[in-house]
Amino acid sequence: TPALRSILSQTFLRCKTAQIAFNIDIQYADFNFIAFPDIYSIFENPLDNAVTACSDIHSTELNKEINLKIVRKNNIIGIDIRNTRENSILIKNGCIQSTKTDPNGHGMGIKNMKRAIQQYDGFITINYDENIFHVSMTIPISKI
């Protein structure tokens, strides 16, 4: 879809400027059944956060890397985004909080992602460890 192409192009340019490896494996890309604003919630927010997290890596021992994989298995679309990180994860009331210095316009991204995915009867899981942040989303195609 044009919206996804635009998001990926912008992310690629930001990664190139910040010397971040951006690895893309797209095996399925028909998102025409998803509304334009929801495409941005589903893709732009986690990729923007990934670029920010990688840009904040100062360790020479950790590669700055973002991996995006989109697959279809039977009637399920799987979206997997992983990035390296060394920034802190701020949790408040069981929710991940924005750590961006300007709080205006920030802090709604993960909520909007969850809302968009759930609107299409999908699921989202977020996991992280010391050096990896991982967002996994599934959307059933039967919702079309």
Which stretches of residues belong to each language-model region?
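Glycine-rich/acidic phosphate-handling loop/turn and adjacent ATP-lid/helix
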Residues: N75-G107
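Conserved ATP-binding N-box helix of the HATPase_c
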Residues: F36-E61, R115, Q119
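Glycine-rich nucleotide-binding loop
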Residues: N87, D129-S136
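Glycine-rich ATP-binding loops of the HATPase_c
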Residues: Q118-D129
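Short beta-to-alpha transition helix within the HATPase_c
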Residues: T1-A18
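A short alpha-helix in the C-terminal ATP-binding CA
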Residues: M108, N112-A116
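Short beta-strand/loop element within the Bergerat-fold HATPase_c
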Residues: T60-N75
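Conserved short strand/loop->alpha-helix "switch" segment adjacent to the catalytic nucleotide/phosphoryl-transfer site
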Residues: F22-F43
